[in-house]
Amino acid sequence: MDLTTVADDLIVLHEGTTVARYEHLQPATTYSFMGREITTLPRPAGELLSRVATVNDVHFGEVEAGRIDDHTEGPIQRTAAGEPPYPETMNRSAVREIAAIDPVAVIVKGDLSQDGQPQEWAAFEACYRPPFGEALHVVRGNHDAYQGQQGYEGDQWIELPGVAVALLDTVLPLHTTGSLTAEQLDWLDAHAAAADRPVIVMGHHQQWIAGGNNDHRSQDYFGLHPDASDALADVFARRPQLLAYTAGHTHRHRVRRMPCGAPSIEIGCVKDFPGTWAEYRVYEGGIIQVVHRISSREALAWSERCRHLYRDFGIDYESYALGALEDRCCTIPLR
């Protein structure tokens, strides 16, 4: 059984398509559920000012999960005949869950599509725009610009109750990797210097941070180029209003630290295992990140089929994608 979510008032466990959900709990309190001792997150001081939801790697138009280029190894999962496309199943279930928390904003951090085709973007818009309207804020990912498309390009500054979001366009059209220009970093620096509230920075590509397997600097790094990553970390070091950078792209949950101590966060994809979206609870004294596994029966049936994608390549996708609980559910303190 997976312990998937722990918030300040919520604990959720999953086993297959079975969900055990415990609500209305007390913060920083240990409970015994399903034979496990589980402690809820502490609640930051002050009032709850807003809730913000994010998704990434939603991939409308994708028809095969687990496919790597032209390889036949997998396992590769496809929707059965007569079933709706799995991006529709996963995203429509995510939208229903997100709408239930009444967020002040829904941020989409790229890879709306499989190949940036008009019908794929139209499917994304049909799913997300009607329920959220002007609260929906979108930036592109690499899959949206492989043919040089310009849809959803550009940086955005989004002011919300208790927090601002700096949504960065990290895409290099025609490329898988990402970067940030000096002009973008100056824009972020100027906005952070003038900000009258804490700021979360978001983008599609994850940051390069030295350590582990990342000590080799390369412009072929799968995420943000190392020089741009370092420059982003330098802005964070100068501007304590910047609390965290959160990205997608890797289809995993992970938290690392910049040299200044600010967290650099990756959030998993909507489209396959474990199939998640993230909630940010903004309090006067800090922010709680709560990752939710999409839990409709049809969504769980699909995401469970994807638990062992890439197994034939020796990849433990289950562990990689799910990450540690503290990577999914954590407190982001004020700096």
Predicted segments, located by residue:
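Beta-strand-enriched, solvent-exposed domains that form extended recognition/catalytic surfaces
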Residues: 1-46
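A short C-terminal boundary segment appended to hydrolase-like catalytic domains
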Residues: 15, 284-335
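N-terminal active-site segment of His-dependent metallophosphoesterases
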Residues: 27, 32-117
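Extended active-site neighborhood of metal-dependent phosphoesterases/phosphodiesterases
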Residues: 41-44, 118-193, 222-227, 231, ...
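Beta-strand-turn-beta hairpins that frame and shape the catalytic cleft
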Residues: 43-53, 61-67, 157-167, 194-200, ...
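Acidic/histidine-rich helix-loop elements
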Residues: 56-89, 145-152, 173-180, 215-221, ...
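Active-site glycine-centered loops adjacent to acidic/histidine catalytic or metal-binding residues
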Residues: 57, 110-111, 141-142, 204, ...
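His/acidic metal-ligating clusters that form di-metal
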Residues: 94-105, 175-263, 313-335
